[in-house]
Swiss-Prot record:
Glycans are attached at residues 7, 13, 22. It comes from Homo sapiens. This is Alpha-1A adrenergic receptor. C-terminal Ser or Thr residues may be phosphorylated. Changing residue 349 to A: Abolishes targeting to the nuclear membrane of cardiac myocytes. PROSITE patterns: G_PROTEIN_RECEP_F1_1 (PS00237), G_PROTEIN_RECEP_F1_2 (PS50262). Belongs to the G-protein coupled receptor 1 family. Adrenergic receptor subfamily. ADRA1A sub-subfamily. The keyword Zinc does not apply. GO terms for biological process: adenylate cyclase-activating adrenergic receptor signaling pathway; adult heart development; apoptotic process; cell growth involved in cardiac muscle cell development; cell-cell signaling; G protein-coupled receptor signaling pathway; intracellular signal transduction; MAPK cascade. GO terms for molecular function: alpha1-adrenergic receptor activity; protein heterodimerization activity.
Length: 466
């Protein structure tokens, strides 16, 4: 990260003419570092646009990801170009004042990025541990306050050298060296890396424990019966639920379990994606924060200039690879990236021609007819359906819950009297409204046709989302 690379520790305070530049080496470094910087800038811009242009990504978790992308974008656009020029030329060409400002901005952006990952880890712990209460715990206001605290703490850590907390600067202004003042190195290493890292590791360890426990609990509630057609039926049982009770209470229990399973599966998948981000962060930054304090407190063990430059740029690399991680580990981001690259911004509502249309036959026919895998479970005056199609150990689970008629735009097909077609726009995961109509068309124009909200999710045999 941070305080700036430099090879000034072996230089004198006397002004010396810059060494001649090796042209072939400069061109090679320029191409490699320039490509890395360009990739980081464009990738982080793509992350920001993907969230900004898709309403279903307008959540507190994704705002944290945008904050991470903003910090990385500032680093790759305002710090890395000067770092690359420094490496290519072999000396600092922008003066002492700008060297100090550049160093402070470097520390600011890197610290904000690391603390942003810390906030994300806490967010994922809450999401996995309390999936149903998450929206009330993590509100937009609290999310904004957390981000303000991140940048405030980052600013406090970064401005110390601007107020004199550093070793005396060399007289030669072509030298822009790293701040090796032991007190500041310890303060910045603890505040910028080790304390956030400790929080991140604790949070993700707890996420792992909770996810394992919840997966076992949810799996125990899935009772399946195999048939010759390799179709299985989902039966929901609420743990510790009373044996007796009204049908309404039982139905509410089943619905609550289903919603809990959906929310937990989504939060767990998000935690996996961001866990990969954190893993890459540790691999990129840990070498630097091991080398830096050792070189400051034990000069005899200071690594060579080449080793220092490698671990220094390895930390910078972290700000460029996050945009690769999102689409590779999240289908949600992959589709959002594709839409942005195709200039298909979805800020506005999609037109009806892009809406998903589904036709559903009456449930009585589905249960008694050819669709033996469709099970009808009464939920009060409404209905819930569960279906699992088993293929190579992967099951597709569909949860149908009734919803108000006004939530979907309903059109009755004149050619198909056995069903009614409903259309609705998909959101963060597949959400489709289907209408179950009577087997014969109704003569009453004001007849209220019930609608059904469909949630589709793929589960493996152990109940985990795939």
């Amino acid at each position: 990260m941070v305080f700036l690379s430099g090879n000034a520790s072996d230089s004198s305070n006397c002004t010396q003419p810059p060494a001649p530049v090796n042209i072939s080496k400069a061109i090679l470094l320029g191409v490699i570092l320039g490509g890395l910087i360009l990739f980081g800038v464009l990738g982080n811009i793509l992350v920001i646009l993907s969230v900004a242009c898709h309403r279903h990504l307008h959540s507190v978790t994704h705002y944290y990801i945008v904050n991470l992308a903003v910090a990385d974008l500032l680093l790759t656009s305002t710090v890395l170009p000067f770092s690359a020029i420094f490496e290519v030329l072999g000396y600092w060409a922008f003066g002492r004042v700008f060297c100090n400002i550049w160093a402070a901005v470097d520390v600011l952006c890197c610290t904000a990025s690391i603390m942003g990952l810390c906030i994300i880890s806490i967010d994922r712990y809450i999401g996995v541990s309390y999936p149903l209460r998450y929206p009330t715990i993590v509100t937009q206001r609290r999310g904004l306050m957390a981000l303000l605290c991140v940048w405030a703490l980052s600013l406090v850590i970064s401005i110390g050298p601007l107020f004199g907390w550093r070793q005396p600067a060399p007289e030669d202004e072509t030298i822009c060296q790293i701040n090796e003042e032991p007190g500041y190195v310890l303060f910045s290493a603890l505040g910028s890396f080790y304390l956030p890292l400790a929080i991140i590791l604790v949070m993700y360890c707890r996420v792992y424990v909770v996810a394992k426990r919840e997966s076992r609990g949810l799996k125990s509630g899935l009772k399946t019966d195999k048939s010759d057609s390799e179709q299985v039926t989902l039966r929901i049982h609420r743990k510790n639920a009373p044996a007796g009770g009204s049908g309404m209470a039982s139905a509410k229990t089943k619905t609550h379990f289903s919603v809990r399973l959906l929310k937990f599966s989504r939060e767990k998948k998000a935690a996996k994606t961001l866990g990969i981000v954190v893993g890459c962060f540790v691999l990129c930054w840990l070498p630097f924060f091991l080398v830096m304090p050792i070189g400051s407190f034990f000069p005899d063990f200071k690594p060579s200039e080449t080793v220092f430059k490698i671990v220094f740029w390895l930390g910078y690399l972290n700000s460029c690879i996050n945009p690769i991680i999102y689409p590779c580990s999240s289908q949600e981001f992959k589709k959002a990236f594709q839409n942005v690259l195709r200039i298909q911004c979805l800020c506005r509502k999609q037109s009806s021609k892009h809406a998903l249309g589904y036709t559903l036959h009456p449930p009585s026919q589905a249960v008694e007819g050819q669709h033996k895998d469709m099970v009808r479970i009464p939920v009060g005056s409404r209905e819930t359906f569960y279906r699992i199609s088993k293929t190579d150990g992967v099951c597709e689970w569909k949860f149908f819950s009734s919803m108000p008629r006004g939530s979907a735009r309903i059109t009755v097909s004149k050619d198909q009297s056995s069903c009614t077609t409903a259309r609705v726009r998909s959101k963060s995961f597949l959400q489709v409204c289907c209408c179950v109509g009577p087997s014969t068309p109704s003569l009453d124009k004001n007849h209220q046709v019930p609608t059904i909200k469909v949630h589709t999710i793929s589960l493996s045999e152990n109940g985990e989302e795939v």
